[in-house]
Amino acid sequence: MITEDIRYIGVNDHDIDLFEGQYQVPNGISYNSYVIMDEKIAIMDTVDKRKQTEFLGNLETALAGRTPDYLVISHMEPDHASSIQAVVERYPEITLVGNAKTFPMLKLYFDLDTSRALTVKEGDTLKLGRHELTFVMAPMVHWPEVMVSYDSCDK
């Protein structure tokens, strides 16, 4: 638990020995994902498919019977995004949140209906209840579609 209503649902991967196939990680890596529990629920990224089952279990535990409203996609690289399909299959009413570069990339990885997608741009906000996310574009920090989210409630 990060705060009363922000929960870590990521997974540690101690089985991997190379990050991105080239960087040695003798202790493995962490796939970070969070869920914000508010009037509306937002999942912040997913995890690598290698740890998808554990991630979905963590998500289900955190949700405690509730259904998520949004999946915020801040980065399309597989270690952040390869469990998107599984989340959408489990929660078909979920709205995918990304920027203008996210959704064309999403279609390259998954066969998903993006009619429930919400495209955000620099400075847009998403009100969840007490929590309000502000989106900041960070292109080429790593990949061209990268964005970050700022929660004005818990900073």
Predicted feature locations:
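Metallo-beta-lactamase
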Residues: M1-E4, G98-V146
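Short, flexible, glycine/charge-rich loop motifs used to bind or transfer phosphoryl groups or to couple energy/partner
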Residues: Y23-Q24, N32, E60-A62, A86-V87, ...
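Short catalytic-loop micro-motif centered on adjacent basic/acidic residues
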Residues: A42-D45, Y70-I73, F135
